[in-house]
């Protein structure tokens, strides 16, 4: 039995206007913040890397974002829900680089419960401060009633999710789960695996990529010569070739920032995460002598590159430039000239070859200077005409 005041409150609540935008905001909050626990990243099971994703509800973004991956939830509250057939959902899931859709099952007139919940919340807010004791009791009862209604709505929406249909990348994958969180995780993992078609180029991931970067940058000369020649899975040959091809074009004329390289390969179709996987490839090409690393107008050497390549905040300070390297035939000819001059075969690696040439030429120059000095003057005097005459006369 309701009192007159309770009946009046009920009528006033029913008269409260609720817009479609308010309904959508509530559903988005219930689905994304409570049922899916505010999740904004998915951990790829195979690579253990994290991927951010956008959240959409009925075609509108929730908490604006601009990532490669998008998870959209279609609900009966949406104006186009009835029009979204399997064919249209499949087509919509093919939009953008990586999109997945969960279309909720249409069960139990959830829209009426959502509207009633919002009407009560909207009615109670401005009434509390000025309410009489009797009205305050009525409002508290309605607040308790709404708390229970919210719990029922969460259960109902969760059931509608697991009973719904899923679509991704223009397909309708066979993904079913008992819980909404598991459903979303399975669907997003499917999205990662099929959006990033070159994710598998990195076959082997370092257990400690930072330690691996340091090891590469401080490798000895023998190890350096083998760093970029890896053709096995352990050397991630496909990923290394992909990086080499990109830098051969992008960094041949202009310098490219390391931060831009990392951002590029984190996106589709590569999806290389974390950033250290990309930096490790750059470090290998650098130590193999294929690229130069420049910071503050100074060329970096291996040990000098350790600090900026192991701190993400420094990536914007490091520029990459493709080095001009000689082919095998040219290097072999230079090695043979060195052998003829100095009776020893120098290293094949370009930097080591140049360094050996300079060292031995410097030693030869010093030896000749000592020889001319021993003959009675500086080496410059040996070429003066009078020096040659004196030497010839003395010989007679």
Task: Tell me what each language-model feature is.
Residues 1-375, 380-396:
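Extended alpha-helical interface modules used as scaffolds for assembling large macromolecular complexes
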């Amino acid at each position: 039995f309701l009192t007159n005041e309770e009946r009046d409150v009920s009528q006033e609540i029913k008269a409260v206007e609720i817009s479609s935008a308010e309904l959508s905001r509530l559903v988005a909050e219930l689905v994304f913040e409570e049922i899916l626990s505010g999740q904004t990243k998915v951990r790829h099971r195979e690579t253990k890397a994290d991927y951010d994703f956008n959240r959409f509800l009925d075609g509108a973004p929730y908490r604006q974002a601009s990532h490669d991956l998008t998870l959209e939830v279609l609900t009966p509250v949406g104006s186009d829900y009835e029009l979204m057939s399997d064919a249209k959902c499949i087509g919509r899931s093919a939009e953008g680089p990586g999109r997945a859709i969960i279309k909720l099952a249409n069960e139990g007139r959830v829209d009426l419960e959502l509207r009633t919940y919002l009407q009560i919340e909207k009615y109670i807010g401005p009434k509390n401060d000025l309410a009489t004791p009797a009205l305050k009791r009525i409002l508290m009862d309605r607040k308790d009633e709404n708390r229970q209604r919210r719990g029922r709505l969460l259960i109902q929406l969760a059931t509608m999710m697991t009973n719904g249909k899923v679509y991704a990348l223009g397909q309708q994958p066979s993904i079913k789960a008992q819980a909404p969180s598991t459903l979303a995780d399975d669907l997003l993992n499917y999205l990662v695996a099929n959006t990033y078609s070159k994710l598998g180029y990195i076959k082997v991931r370092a257990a400690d990529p930072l330690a691996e970067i340091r090891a590469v940058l401080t490798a000895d000369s023998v190890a350096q010569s083998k760093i970029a020649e890896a053709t096995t899975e352990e050397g991630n040959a496909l990923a290394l070739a992909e990086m080499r091809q990109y830098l051969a074009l992008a960094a041949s004329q202009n310098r490219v920032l390391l931060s831009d390289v990392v951002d590029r390969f984190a996106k589709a179709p590569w999806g290389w995460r974390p950033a250290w996987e990309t930096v490790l490839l750059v470090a290998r090409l650098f130590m193999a002598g294929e690229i130069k690393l420049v910071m503050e107008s100074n060329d970096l050497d291996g040990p000098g590159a350790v600090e900026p390549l192991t701190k993400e905040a420094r990536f914007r300070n490091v520029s990459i430039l493709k080095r001009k390297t000689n082919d095998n035939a040219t290097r072999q000819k230079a090695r043979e000239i060195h052998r003829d001059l100095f009776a020893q075969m120098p290293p094949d690696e370009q930097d080591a070859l140049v360094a050996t040439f300079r060292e031995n030429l410097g030693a030869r120059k010093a030896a000749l200077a000592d020889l001319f000095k021993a003959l009675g003057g500086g080496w410059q005097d040996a070429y003066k005409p009078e020096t040659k005459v004196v030497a010839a006369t003395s010989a007679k």
